[in-house]
Amino acid sequence: MTKYALVGDVGGTNARLALCDIASGEISQAKTYSGLDYPSLEAVIRVYLEEHKVEVKDGCIAIACPITGDWVAMTNHTWAFSIAEMKKNLGFSHLEIINDFTAVSMAIPMLKKEHLIQFGGAEPIEGKPIAVYGAGTGLGVAHLVHVDKRWVSLPGEGGHVDFAPNSEEEGIILEILRAEIGHVSAERVLSGPGLVNLYRAIVKADNRLPENLKPKDITERALADSCTDCRRALSLFCVIMGRFGGNLALNLGTFGGVFIAGGIVPRFLEFFKASGFRAAFEDKGRFKEYVHDIPVYLIVHDNPGLLGSGAHLRQTLGHIL
C-alpha cells in the first residue's frame, strides 16, 4: 500500500499543498489555496487533508522566510506558529518546516533533463557543490553539497548581500537607489520590484520622470520593443543576474552547476538567451577561466518547491536520493 506524506510550498500569497509518495518521491494531488482565506497554515492543512480523505503522519512544508527555530513568523503574511505545536495538533510523527530555497535546492537531484535548460558551460561534475538562486517577489539563494551519500542544503539570506555594481551605468543606478532607500541589496535589483527599481533609476538618471509601471508592464514593453527604457532595464536585469550567479559560483566552487529558479526568467526566455547573461557570469577578471566551464541551468519544472520538500523529508526518513 502506498504511503504518503504531506508536502507544501507556502509564499506570501498562496499555499500549495500536495501528497508525496514516500517510496518514489512522486508528487500528486497538488492544490493551491489563497492565504487570505484562512486564519492559519494549520487550518489550510486540515482543509486539504479533509478534501483528499487521506491520513498522513509525516510532512514537510517550505516557507518563504528564514527558519531559525521552533517559532516561525512569515515575512509577507500574518501567519505565525510553533512547529512543535502544529506537529502535535495535526498528530504527525514528523513535521519539517524548511526555507523555500532549501526546498528548491533539494529538488535539484530529483530533476530530469527535460526540467532544465542549459546556458553555457560544460557538463556538471558529479559530487561537486551546487548553487541555486531565483528572482521572484524577492531573491532566494541556497547551496547544495553531497556528503556521505546525503545531500545537505546550505540555506541563507544571500539575496540581501550588497548590490555590487561593475560598470558606470550600474554605479549611477546604485547612487540613485541608495538616495531613495538607503541600503541597496542584490534583491533590490534582482526581483519583480527590483526590475521596477532598475527602470525607474534608468529614467531618473536621464533627469526624466518614470511612469508608474509594474514588472509585467516593463517586461511586455521590452519584449514588444516599444519602450527603450524598459528594454534597457530588462537587459540590465539579465546582466546583473549573470554577475550574481558568477559570484555564487566563485563562493563555493560550484562545478556541480548553478541553477536558476523563480517565476521571472521563464517569462522572457528568448530575450534572456540573447542577453549578456552568460558573458556577465564569466566576467570575473583573473578568474574568468575558473568559471568558464561551470554550467548554468534554468529550472522549468512546475513545482520544484513541492518536489524538494518531498526529497528533504524522504532523506530525513532515511531514503537515499
From Swiss-Prot:
Range of residues in the leader sequence: none
Assigned protein family: Belongs to the bacterial glucokinase family.
Catalytic activity, EC: 2.7.1.2
Domain of life the protein comes from: Bacteria
Catalytic activity: D-glucose + ATP = D-glucose 6-phosphate + ADP + H(+)
Subcellular location: Cytoplasm
NCBIfam families: glk (TIGR00749), PRK00292.1-1 (NF001414), PRK00292.1-3 (NF001416)
Name of this chain's protein: Glucokinase
Source species of the chain: Escherichia coli O7:K1 (strain IAI39 / ExPEC)
Gene that produces this protein: glk
InterPro entries cross-referenced by the UniProt entry: ATPase_NBD, Bacterial_glucokinase, Glucokinase
GO cellular component, one term: cytosol
Gene Ontology biological-process annotations: glycolytic process
